[in-house]
């Protein structure tokens, strides 16, 4: 084979020409027509072909937590290139881009202010397209992802995910829900209080929604090709009852917040978007100790498994039915109303159940296991018809270890207050003009 410049330039391509391409380390043939088949139409919509997507597959009742990832694996890096840490103001506008290698600095190398209540430390995620499918013949769950507008795919709107657990702070006579470093997170509040405090910060803010968390969790699955977050970030082995009933000995911490291992921002010393620290030691008020490993993924600290539950907005369960908010940013109601839409029935049994509706990778309606606990985990009730249940995510120190992965719980009612329940801040991206869930046609 001669040098590239030794060959004359082709003219008037007809589509039946053959090219040599490098695929999985081997040189193979491809036609111009095949490459053109992946091109968008005149409306900018791409066809659903392997070149335009990365696909994650998992079999129902699969014992392993690992997944099969196929098609264009280079799409994973393209999707993750859309995400970055930043500081946003009270209008949810980016005021500083943080250094992805070292978030204590801006991209310009200047010191970053991560503890100012007027600027929230967030990770911008979303901005891609995805599609869920189920193959009944092979009993396989399939999720497809693309940075392109692929026909039949739904748009995942850009949004800001918290870098840190939620902190309630009073400023100007109003409580605000913050995502700041070097502060104690706030537990022992109800979801209405958290959401109100988020809205006090600005119209685009909200207490983190289940939909926000699901996107974050799916990105972990896609990046790690595995569903068991505790395989990478172990926070098991806590005495949950003791932890919940023992006040934090630090005088700066609220004594009602019994589930804090450290102030936010401890993982800022981890370079890059993910990793965990060496074992740290926590000392209880009675002198007892526990060790743990602070971690972060996608620049967000402690959102895959942790010592306390995080209350979420965006979904409700009542009378054995699940509902989701039609618009997670504008919905402020915590009761079933016109702002919610029905998605599926919940089982009418009493106890815990795993693997539920389509928004997860393990919908029980399609035959998923009710015992493996590979994903969602919530309380079902046999007779209740009036109470409203809300989702909680991440997992308590004992619950998370029982489940073995990031998880979803549901709580009894919207107004309870527990020392092992916190929340976190999320925000819409007002610069994104495409509605969430838009289907490419």
Please identify what each model-predicted range represents:
Residues 21-38:
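Short, surface-exposed terminal/edge motifs of secreted or surface/virion proteins that either
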Residues 116-119, 144-304:
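Short aromatic-cysteine micro-motif
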Residues 1-16, 439-441:
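Short, intrinsically disordered N-terminal pre-domain segments
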Residues 42-129, 133-182, 272-275, 297-298, ...:
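Short acidic-hydrophobic catalytic motif
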Residues 214, 236-267, 308-317, 330, ...:
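C-terminal, surface-exposed recognition/capping segments
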Residues 166-191, 323-349:
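A solvent-exposed, charged loop/short amphipathic helix patch at secondary-structure junctions
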Residues 16-23, 300-302:
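Short hydrophobic/aromatic-rich beta-strand motifs
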Residues 23-26, 128-130, 166-168, 212, ...:
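Acidic glycine-/aspartate-rich tracts in secreted/extracellular proteins
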């Amino acid at each position: 084979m001669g040098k590239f410049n030794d060959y004359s330039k082709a003219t008037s391509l007809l589509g039946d020409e053959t090219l040599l391409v490098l695929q999985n380390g081997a040189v193979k043939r491809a036609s111009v027509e095949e490459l053109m088949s992946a091109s968008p139409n005149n409306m900018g919509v791409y066809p659903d072909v392997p070149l335009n997507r990365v696909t994650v597959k998992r079999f129902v009742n699969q014992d392993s937590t690992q997944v099969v990832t196929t098609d264009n694996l280079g799409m994973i890096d393209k999707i993750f290139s859309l995400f970055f840490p930043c500081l946003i103001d009270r209008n949810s506008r980016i005021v500083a881009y943080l250094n992805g290698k070292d978030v204590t600095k801006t991209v310009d190398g200047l010191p970053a202010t991560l503890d100012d209540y007027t600027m929230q430390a967030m990770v911008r995620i979303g901005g891609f397209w995805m599609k869920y499918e189920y193959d009944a013949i092979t009993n396989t769950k399939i999720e497809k992802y693309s940075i392109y507008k692929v026909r039949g795919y739904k748009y995942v709107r850009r949004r800001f995910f918290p870098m840190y657990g939620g902190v309630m702070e009073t400023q100007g006579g109003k409580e605000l829900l913050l995502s700041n470093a070097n502060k104690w997170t706030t537990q022992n509040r109800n979801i209405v209080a958290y959401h109100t405090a988020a809205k006090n910060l600005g119209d685009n803010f909200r207490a983190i929604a289940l939909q926000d968390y699901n996107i974050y969790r799916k990105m972990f699955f896609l990046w790690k090709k595995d569903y068991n977050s505790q395989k990478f970030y172990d926070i098991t082995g806590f005495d949950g009852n003791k932890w919940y009933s023992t006040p934090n000995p630090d005088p700066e911490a609220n004594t009602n917040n019994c589930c804090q291992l450290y102030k936010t921002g401890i993982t800022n010393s981890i370079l890059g978007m993910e990793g965990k620290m060496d074992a740290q030691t926590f000392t209880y008020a009675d002198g007892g100790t526990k060790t743990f490993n602070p971690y972060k993924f996608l620049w967000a600290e402690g959102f895959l498994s942790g010592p306390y539950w995080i209350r979420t907005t965006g979904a409700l369960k009542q009378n054995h039915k699940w509902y989701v908010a039609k618009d997670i940013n504008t919905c402020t109601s915590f009761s079933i109303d016109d702002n919610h839409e029905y998605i599926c029935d919940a089982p009418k049994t009493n106890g815990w159940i795993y693997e539920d509706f389509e928004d997860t990778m393990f919908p029980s309606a399609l035959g998923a296991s009710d015992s493996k606990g590979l994903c969602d985990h919530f309380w079902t009730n046999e007779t209740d018809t009036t109470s409203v249940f809300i989702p909680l995510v991440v997992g308590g120190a004992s619950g998370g270890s029982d489940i073995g992965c990031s998880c979803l719980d549901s709580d009894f009612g919207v107004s309870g207050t527990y020392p092992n329940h916190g929340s976190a801040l999320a925000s819409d991206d007002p610069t994104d003009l495409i509605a969430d869930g838009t289907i490419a046609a």
